[in-house]
Amino acid sequence: MLTGSLVAIVTPMLEDGSVDFEALDRLVDFHIESGTSGIVAVGTTGESAALAVEEHLQVVAAVVKRAAGRIKVIAGAGANSTHEAIDLTRESRRLGADQVLSVVPYYNKPTQEGMYRHFRAIAESTDIPVILYNVPGRTVADMCNDTVLRLAEIPNIIGLKDATADLARCCDLVKRAPKDFALYTGDDATAMAFMLCGGHGVISVTANVAPRQMAELCRAAIAGDVQAARRINDPLQGLHKDLFCEANPIPVKWALERMGRIPAGIRLPLTRLSDAGQSKVEAALKAANLI
């Protein structure tokens, strides 16, 4: 099982909106050097919704190539069309991704049975390991724990990214899910508590700017070292909050630009971080000793 800090990596772009593959290569190296456990490419933070399918697959291929087996690569492969999600999943496997992250279908608001059949069809279409992704704040459809547990019975559905920030439901899954079913939080602010209650890691936005610290936090929390986890987490609290002061990934892309790691590009309908947001993120970066 893959545990620890998995970065929900941004997709660097030039100011004209084209993907900056050289900057992407540098970010992959940065995470390998910093102890990140895995790279989640073209998810929410990677602006998958703003990429054409061809670009989406080019980013997956680039991350796999640069990783070169040095770090696990999880490819975002979700869609609100089951057929499209199957195609993305198969292509991700062909390109060499180790696992895929598959989001609950958005906009069309499926029932729990619809979610179950959607993910079952994806899993049965290929043998690549699938991580489910529940983020009702974006999809407007919330997959309940009972549905997750039904899906956990399918051999290549291996885990869940829960981005609800609901610790009670996460801890319920820790108690009820198979022991080899990976449970990741998608909420940096509650990640420490989630891992202390038995979660296996975090798919993190904060790790984009603080990969070493997030990797250390995960090691401490998973080991049950509360004091060490708090010591590492406290300076990151501002980032956990203010990297969401506007829609993700607007703040984190600005933060990486401020740190000199990527250019300023972001795609419409997302726009550059506001002046007020820049002040907040700047202060959070300073509090974490990152600038």
Swiss-Prot record:
GO terms for molecular function: 4-hydroxy-tetrahydrodipicolinate synthase activity. Belongs to the DapA family. CDD domains: DHDPS (cd00950). GO terms for cellular component: cytosol. One of its GO terms (biological process) is diaminopimelate biosynthetic process. Its EC number is 4.3.3.7. Catalyzes the condensation of (S)-aspartate-beta-semialdehyde [(S)-ASA] and pyruvate to 4-hydroxy-tetrahydrodipicolinate (HTPA). PANTHER family: 4-HYDROXY-2-OXOGLUTARATE ALDOLASE, MITOCHONDRIAL (PTHR12128:SF66), DIHYDRODIPICOLINATE SYNTHASE (PTHR12128). The record marks 44, 107 as: Part of a proton relay during catalysis. Its main location: cytoplasm. Pyruvate binds at residues 45, 203. Gene3D superfamilies: Aldolase class I. Pathway: Amino-acid biosynthesis; L-lysine biosynthesis via DAP pathway; (S)-tetrahydrodipicolinate from L-aspartate: step 3/4. The keyword DNA damage does not apply. The keyword Protease does not apply. It catalyses: L-aspartate 4-semialdehyde + pyruvate = (2S,4S)-4-hydroxy-2,3,4,5-tetrahydrodipicolinate + H2O + H(+). The active site is at 133 (proton donor/acceptor), 161 (schiff-base intermediate with substrate). Homotetramer; dimer of dimers. This is 4-hydroxy-tetrahydrodipicolinate synthase. Keywords: Amino-acid biosynthesis, Cytoplasm, Diaminopimelate biosynthesis, Lyase, Lysine biosynthesis, Schiff base. It is found in: Cytoplasm.
